[in-house]
Amino acid sequence: MMVEDKILNFEKMGLGLFIHWGLYAHFAEGEWAQNILEVPNYSQAFTHFNPDPKKIRQWVTLAKQNGFKYIVLTAKHHDGFCLFDTKGISEFDSMHTPFKADVIKIFVDECHRQGIAPFLYFATYDWHNPKYTADL
């Protein structure tokens, strides 16, 4: 399938939901919390990350009930925290939290179960990389 066809298919899907959610939700200051709050121990917040899997499934249910055809979820934002099992590439992921589960797997499995298309947002910028601000 050509890129143009994929774009047209995406546009035909219509109404979608974009969920910005991750470690930064702990601070209730949005996805740029580390920069806004200058939280010195932001990276340690993952020791408190323990979402309710039922809530993740409820996002899909609510989206489906309200006519959304797809959902985009942040798999990794600029803070570098991964909502998926990095398989040893990083310990800054949901598997190394009290939650000890792959949020993305739960989300994608539930989307498939309910017949709604899952999409993922993955930020290549990472605050932990010293070159992070070089291109800004």
Residue ranges and their predicted role:
Residues M1-L136:
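Mature catalytic domains of secreted/periplasmic carbohydrate-active enzymes
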